[in-house]
Amino acid sequence: MIRVLPRALALAGLIVLFVAPAWAVTPTEQLKGSIEKILPILDEPSLKGDAKTKERRAAIRAVANEIFDFTESARLCLGPHWDRRTDQERQEFARLLGDLLERAFAARLEQYGGERIAYTGEAVDGNLATVKTKIITKAGVELPVDYQVLRRGDRWLVYDVLIEGVSLMGNYRAQFNKIIQTS
């Protein structure tokens, strides 16, 4: 027993060394790192112009796939209708929602003109967190944007975005609910 204890402690130490850094990343640090991957895409001269739209959006989508949990976003959007969908319908809806978000965000991102992002706070509650930011325009106008994130393994993934306090997924949920109820 005494001979096993040092080995167990050594193993525990190794696990902490290799696992702790993944868990040590805060939601804000992870989101900031991901956003910092998108900004160079928008500034890249070889991706500018209408002829490069498809290529530019594919690069943005690749980063979005690292940041977003489209399945959780889809579940939120469908609300009570989610449980009545088959796995195949859920996967298809999540994919289509990802496409919708890509088009909506990509169009706005392509209008990027040197705005700054200020990270103003973070609230973590277990596996859920809110990352508070402000987008600051060149004119000094501040637009509050909060990201609702959840932990999946060692990553924090966005599942909702609140712009000036209004939930994007809540907005889609109201629209989809109306469509589903009338069809």
PLM feature spans:
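Bacterial N-terminal signal peptides that target proteins for export
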Residues: 1-10
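Cleavable N-terminal signal peptides
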Residues: 11-12, 22
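Sec/Tat signal peptide C-region and signal peptidase I cleavage site
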Residues: 18-24
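Early exported N-terminus immediately downstream of N-terminal targeting peptides
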Residues: 26-105
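Surface-exposed, polar/charged faces of alpha-helical domains
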Residues: 44-51, 55, 84-91, 111-114, ...
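Surface-exposed, charged secondary-structure patches
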Residues: 103-143
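Short beta-strand edge/turn micro-motifs at domain boundaries
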Residues: 142-170
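Non-transmembrane domains of secretory- and envelope-associated proteins
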Residues: 167, 171-183
